[in-house]
Amino acid sequence: MAAIGRGRSLKNLRIRGRNDSGEENVPLDLTREPSDNLREILQNVAKLQGVSNMRKLGHLNNFTKLLCDIGHSEEKLGFNYEDIIICLRLALLNEAKEVRAAGLRALRYLIQDSSILQKVLKLKVDYLIARCIDIQQSNEVERTQALRLVRKMITVNASLFPSSVANSLIAVGNDGLQERDRMVRACIAIICELALQNPEVVALRGGLNTILKNVIDCQLSRINEALITTILHLLNHPKTRQYVRADVELERILAPYTDFHYRHSPDTAEGQLKEDREARFLASKMGIIATFRSWAGIINLCKPGNSGIQSLIGVLCIPNMEIRRGLLEVLYDIFRLPLPVVTDEFIEALLSVDPGRFQDSWRLSDGFVAAEAKTILPHRARSRPDLMDNYLALILSAFIRNGLLEGLVEVITNSDDHISVRATILLGELLHMANTILPHSHSHHLHCLPTLMNMAASFDIPKEKRLRASAALNCLNRFHEMKKRGPKPYSLHLDHIIQKAIATHHKRDQYLRVQKDIFVLKDTEEALLINLRDSQVLQHKENLDWDWNLIGTILKWPNVNLRNYKDEQLHRFVRRLLYFYKPSSKLYASLDLDLAKSKQLTVVGCQFTEFLLESEEDGQGYLEDLVKDIVQWLNASSGVKPERSLQNNGLLTTLSQHYFLFIGTLSCHPHGVKMLEKCSVFQCLLNLCSLKNQDHLIKLTVSSLDYSRDGLARVILSKILTAATDACRLYATKHLRVLLRANVEFFNNWGIELLVTQLHDKNKTISSEALDILDEACEDKANLHALIQMKPALSHLGDKGLLLLLRFLSIPKGFSYLNERGYVAKQLEKWHKEYNSKYVDLIEEQLNEALTTYRKPIDGDNYVRRSNQRLQRPHVYLPVHLYGQLVHHKTGCHLLEVQSIITELCHNVRTPDLDKWEDIKKLKASLWALGNIGSSNWGLNLLQEENVIPDILKLAKQCEVLSIRGTCVYVLGLIAKTKQGCDILKCHSWDSVRHSRKHLWPVVPDDVEQLCNELSSVPSTLSLNSESTSSRHNSESESAPSSMFMLEDDRFGSTSTSTFFLDINEDAEPAFYDRPGPIKDKNSFPFFGSSKLVKNRILNSLTLPTKKHRSSSDPKGGKLSSENKTSNRRIRTLTEPSVDLNHSEDFTSSSAQKSLQLEPSFVGNKHLEDAGSTPSIGENDLKFPKSFGTETHRENTSRERLVVEGSASSHIKIRSQSFNTDTTTSGISSMSSSPSRETVAVDPTAMDTDCGSLSTVVSTKTVKTSHYLTPQSNHLSLSKSNSVSLVPPGSSHTLPRRAQSLKAPSIATIKSLADCNFSYTSSRDAFGYATLKRLQQQRMHPSLSHSEALASPAKDVLFTDTITMKANSFESRLTPSRFMKALSYASLDKEDLLSPINHNTLQRSSSVRSMVSSATYGGSDDYIGLALPVDINDIFQIKDVPYFQSKHVPPPDDRGARMFSHDGAGLSSGAGGLVKNSFHLLRQQMSLTEIMNSVHSDASLFLESTEDTGLQEHTDDNCLYCVCIELLGFQPSNQLSSICSHSDLQDIPYSDWCEQTIHNPLEVVPSKFSGISGCSDGASQEEGSASSTKSTELLLGVKTIPDDTPMCRILLRKEVLRLVVNLSSSVSTKCHETGLLTIKEKYPQTFDDICLYSEVSHLLSHCTFRLQCRRFIQELFQDVQFLQMHEEAEAVLAIPPIQPIVDESAES
C-alpha cells in the first residue's frame, strides 16, 4: 500500500509543476527612475497572492531588461544586492516552471562578479538552484536556465562554486542515463568545465569518477575524448595531479579489456550482455586511444611498476579471443595503422591494408589522381622532422619494452585464424615501423623474433602451434616484400606520370627491363608471323578472347614496326587493333572500367599508339585516323548538355576515359605532339577549359598530359589554373603537387611560377593549397632559389605566408634580399615579443588536429569543430622557425649571437616557472626556439657554448609538467638532425635515428661489407651456436664442441648447482675464477652436468686474450680496491637458488641502483637497508626446506660460476666479453650495446610463499638504466623504475610447492634466460594457471626486476627441467641433450645474432643502420630528427603525489569531524561514499519508536541540550530562512519564532508532551511500528513486508503521539533526518523511502518546515545521494509554503528606498 501511495503522491506532486502559462505583457517604462521600476518588479515577484504567474514572468523578464539598460549599480537600483536576491529567490520557489526559469535567468544576469556571487551563495540560493536541477518534471526550460546559471557561476568565480550544485550535477551525471534524463550530457560537460577551473570541489564530490564512468558509457569519440582529456589535463600538472588517485582512476578505462567479468551496470540483462560488452569495448577503446594521444596519458599509463600498458599487453597472453580481437583493434588505432578486413586468408587481409589499394576518394568524381598521389607518393621533405614520427617512436618503444612483440607472437601462435592473421600483420607493421623510426638502442634486436623462429623450428612444441609459427614467418616474409616494393600506383594515370618522369631522368625507355625477356626470341619474320597467328587477332573478332599478352609482346618487339615490315598480315593486325580502339566502333570505349582486363587493354592501347609513332610514315595514317576519331568523340562529349553526354558516353564508368591516356602518351613524344597539333587536339582541349560543367573532362586532361617540355600542354594547364571553374582550378593546383612529388623534369623552372600565380587566386582554398605545395617544394634548394628569384608577395597570406617567406633566410641569397629591406630586424623583434609564443600555438594546433578529433576553424570562425572521421596516418612537419632558418649560415648565427637571444632562452629553460600556464607556454616557446637553433651545426655550436642541452635533457626526464617532457622529446629530436647533435646526445644516454627519409625500408647502408669485416675481426664472446657458425666468424670459441654445455663435474656431490653468473664490476681487474666453499651449498640445483675440459674452453672463450685466468685455488683472486667494493654490479644468472645481498660497508649507492648478488647462502644485512629505501632480504625472508635440493634435483651436479669483470673506466663502459646469447639483440647484449648499467633487485613482498609461479617476464626489450651511481641520486625507487611484462602461456611453468620460496630470486633469473633461446616444453596444463597467477602477482606486488627476457623455447627447457620436472623422471635426465637441441634453434641469422661485437664498432649503434656515416648521405643536416633515451623509462618517472583528501582530514575536536563540515572535510569523493565518522551521530541515533519505547525515557536522553531543535547541523549561516534574519536584523513574529527557537521547551514537562507519566512503560504494537523502526534501523524485515505494513502510526501506550507538541516536532525532525541520511546508502532504500512517505502521510505538516528543508539541503550538498533519492527527497518537500521567506521579502521592500545619494548627485 505504501508503494502504491507513494506512486500516487509523487505523480500528483509532478503535475503541480506543469504550468504552461505564457508571459503576460507587462510594460516597462525605462524613462522612470530605475529604483521605482525595480521596486515594482520586486514587489510583484515577492507577492504570495494577487499576482498571476504570467504577470510574474513578465516582471522577471523586465528585470533583465532593466539590468541590461542601466548596468550594475546599487546606487541606481536603489536596493542592496542582498535585498534584490532575497526577493528574486522567491521566483525559484514558484509552482510554475516558467516563473522558476525566469527567476534563474534573472539571477544569471544579476551575477556579474565575485562579490554578487558570494552574496547569492551566502543567502543559500544554491539550495534552490540544486532543487531546480534535481526535480524532473518535464521542465527542461527551467533546468536549461539552471545549467546556464551554473556555467555563469563557473565563469565568474569557479573557486566559490557550491558543493550543493556540484552534488546535483554529479548525481545527474551518474544516474541520468538510467533515468533517461535528457540533461545528462549537459551536466557532464559542466562537470568537466568545473573540473578544469576548480578540480578540488569536483574531486571531493566524486565528480572525477563520474567523468570516467561516462567515458565507458559514451561511444561518440568527440565526447569520449573531451571527457578523458579533462582527467588528463589534471594529471598533466603537479598541482592538480593530487586530485586524481594514482594507479586507480585513470586505469578504469582499461577495465572492459582487463577484467573478464566486467559489468558496467549490474542491471544489464543477460540477453543484452554481449551487446553491452561490445559497446563498452568501443567506448574503452576510444578512451585508451585518446589517453595515448596525450603526454599525461602516455606517461601515466607507461610509468614503471604496475602500469596500465603492462595490464593491456599482459591480457594478450590469456587465450580469450574476444578480448584479443578488441585489443588488436586498439593497437591498430594507437599506431595509426589501417585495420585489415576480418578474414582467415592472410593475402586477402594484406591486400586490404596495402597503401596502393583503391580508395573511394580516388574516383574521377572525387579527388582522382591528386588524391591518390598525395597518399602514395612520399612527401618531398627528406630530413624535415615529422613530429608524428617522434610521437610514434616513443609509443612504440614503450610498448616494445613492455613485451608487445612477444605478446603478439603468443596471439599469432595460439588464436583463431582471423585473429592470428591480424596479429601477424600488426607484428609486421610494428617491425617495419621500428626499423624506420626507432633508434638503434630500441630497435637493434627487433628483426630477429627468435621466439617465433624457434617455435617454427622446434619439434618440442605441439604441431599445431609449430605450423602456425611457420605460417606466420612466411606471412611476415610476404609482408616484408610488400614493404620493400613500396606502394604501387593504382590508377594508370598516376603510373603514366611516374613512369614518364623516371624515363626522362634515366634517359631510357620504361619498358627496357621487360624487353630483356624478349631478346631470347629469334628476331625473324617467321617468329613474328607465328606470334601474329597465336595472338588470335587475325583468326576471329571476339576481341576479349585475343591473347593480349602476346599482342603487347608484338607491339614492344625490338625493331618491329610497319616501316621495317611490309607484311600484309602485320597491316591486317594493326587495322583490327585500330578498329577495336576507335571510339566510333564502340568496342573498347563501351567496356566497363571494372572489367578484369581493363587495365591490360589500356596499357596495350598506349603501346599501340607508341608502335604507330615508331612506324613513322607507314603508321601515320593509322594514328591520324585514331586521333581524329578521339577528337570527334571529345567534341561530342563536351556538347551542350554535359550531364546527358557524360551519361551517354559513360565517362565515369567505361574505358572511354582512358582515351586521355592515349593523348597523354602522344604528348610525351615530339612526333606525337605534332600529331596532336595536326589533329587539333590541343585546340579542342583549350576550348574545354572555359566550358562549365565539364569538370571530369578537365580533370582527365590535366592528369594525362606531359608537361616536361615547354609547349601547348603547359599553356592548357596554365589556362585551367586561371580560367576554369573553382573546382577545376583547385584540382589543377593539387595536380602541381603530383608533378612535384613525381619529380617531373625542370619543375623549378615552370611549376614554381604557376604556383606563385595561384597564390593570388580569389578563392582562399586554392591560394592556401598553392602555399602548402610551395612550402613542400622549398624542401628542394633548386625550388627555393627559383622562388626567391621571383620575389613573390606573401604577406597577404597570413601566418603560413610569413613562414614561407622565412624560408628565404636559410640561404645567403634570400637573407640578403630580405635584410636589405629591413625585414630581418623587424622579424627578430616580432618573434622576441610575441611570435615565439604563437609558434607554440601553431605546432600544438597541428598536433591536436593530427592526434585528436579537433579540426581547425575555417576562415576565422571561432567555433571549435570536432570530427569523428579518423585521419589516415597524418604528418605534422615542423613549421618554419625564424631562428631555425637563420642558423643555416654564419651570418644568421652571428645575428642571433649579437642580440643575446640564446642567452635569454637558456635562462628561461634553466629557471622555469611552472605555476601559470602563461609561464609554461613561455618555457615551451624557449624550448622550441632552442631546438630549431640546434637543428644545424652552426646553431648547435651556439647551444654548446651555453651548455644548455643537459638542462633540456633534465627537463625531459624530471619536469613535473608532463607536457613539457613531450616538448623536450620533440626538441631533442631537432638537435638530433645532425651527426654532431646525435653524438652530443649519445654522450647523455640518448640515442638518435641516423638516416633520412630518402632511404627506403629496409635501411641498408652502403658499407655493409666494411661492417662485416669489422665484425669478423673481433674476438668472440661465448658463442652458443653450432660449429659452422663459429668457424664463419673465425672466433676463439670455434674450438668449443657442440656439446659444450654437457658439463660434468662431481666434485661437489650430486646435489650442488651449476649456475652461470655474469658479474661485471667496472673497477675490478677482469679475471675468471671458480669459487670454492659456498658452492657446496645443498640448497642449490643444477642446470646441467659439467666437464673440466669443456668448462676450461668456456673460460678461454670468455677471457680476453691479454688477461690471465685466476685459478680456483685463489679464493681472493687478487685484492679488490675499495672502489671496487662500492661499485654497482651487473649480474646475470640462469638460476639463483639463493640471494646474497652485497654487504660491503662502503655500499652507498642509491636505492634505485642496488644490485643483488645471488648466492647459495642467505646473508641478511641491515647496513644495506640503511643505505637506501630498497628493503633487504634477511635470513628470515627466505626459508628453504632442507629437503629441497635432494628431493627435486637429485640427478644433477655441480654449480659453475663464470664471472667477467671489465677493466676500470671513467665512463660506464660495457665490455664485449659478456656471456650472452640473446637472439633478440643481434649478438649485442644490453651489456655490450649500451652505455648503461643494469640492476637487479628483489622485492621481499613478492616472496610470498603462496605464490606458486615463477615470476618471469616476456619482452623483446633489453633493459638499460642510464643512471650514474652516485649516493646523491634522487631517482625513484626500483618499484617504480623497473617494469615487468607477462609471460605468454606456455613460456613458463608453475613451480612445485617446494620451490615456491624461489619465486623472488627467480626474478633476476630472467636476464640470462632471456639471452638463451631454446625450445618449449609441452606441459600445457600450467599455462592458464601460471598466467593468471602472474596477473594477480602483478596487481599485488610491483616486481622489482628489469625484464628483458624473451619467451623462448630454451628458457622453458631450463625452467621445466630444473624446476618442475620430477627428480627421477626420464625427462629430467635428458636435460643436457634437450638443452643442446634447443640451442640449434637459438638463432635466426647466426652471423648477425651471435657474432662477436666490438665495443668500439657497435656500441649504441644500429646493427644495420647506425654504421651509415654522414659521409654516406652527404650533408650534415640529413637525419630525420628523432631521439629517445636509451632507457625509455627515464621519461616515464613521476613523483608520487599524495591524494589530496589525506591533507584535509580535520582534527578530532573539529566541528567538521563531528558532523559534515562546510568544506566537506573528511568526506569521501566516491559515489555514495560516506566517511565513517561523517554521520556516525545521525546513524547512531535511536529511531523515534525506540525513544518512545525506552523505559527510562527522559527529555535529557534524546535532546542534546535544553535548546535542542532536532536539527543537528542547523546554523544561521546554512538555513534559507535564518540567514536572512541574521542579515537583516529582522525580528520574526511569534508565530515564526517557534520554528527554530525552542528555548521554551525547558518549561514544558515531558509528561505534558506525551500526555502520560514518565514512569509508565511504553507499549509497542510491532506490526504498527515496523514501517519506521524496523526498516529504518536496518532490521531483518524484507522490503516487501515493509511496504505492505498496514499502518505506521506512532503509538505511545495505546494513544497516537500528538503531532502538535514541540517534542513531537523535534522527534519527527530527527526521524526525517535519520531516514534521509540512510537514503545516501544504497542499502534498504525502499524501506527508508517508505518510512518517509509514512511520516508524510500521517504528519504532513512535518515537511512544511524551512529549517528542516535547509538542513536536508545541507545534507544533500555534503553527502552523495543517488539521483532517484535526491528527486524523492525534493518531492517530499514540494509542499513547503516558504511563507516566512515571503515575509522576509516583504520586510525588505517595506524599508524606504536609498535615494538621497542619487538625488544629490543629480543636483550637483
From Swiss-Prot:
Record PTM Phosphoserine, positions in chain: 21, 35, 265, 1138, 1161, 1218, 1234, 1273, 1277, 1281, 1283, 1301, 1312, 1345, 1352, 1384, 1387, 1395, 1410, 1570, 1573, 1576, 1591
GO BP annotation list: actin cytoskeleton organization; cellular response to nutrient levels; cytoskeleton organization; embryo development ending in birth or egg hatching; lipid biosynthetic process; negative regulation of apoptotic process; positive regulation of actin filament polymerization; positive regulation of cell growth
Protein's name according to its UniProt entry: Rapamycin-insensitive companion of mTOR
Cross-linked residues, Glycyl lysine isopeptide (Lys-Gly) (interchain with G-Cter in ubiquitin): K274
Knockout consequences: Mice develop normally until 9.5 dpc, and then display growth arrest and embryonic lethality by 11.5 dpc.
Biased composition regions of type Polar residues, renumbered to the chain: 1147-1158
Region (Ribosome-binding domain): 521-570
Compositionally biased residues, Low complexity: 1021-1043, 1221-1239
Modification Phosphothreonine, positions: T1103, T1135, T1270, T1294, T1331, T1375
Subcellular location, principal: membrane
Highest taxon, organism lineage: Eukaryota
Source species: Mus musculus (Mouse)
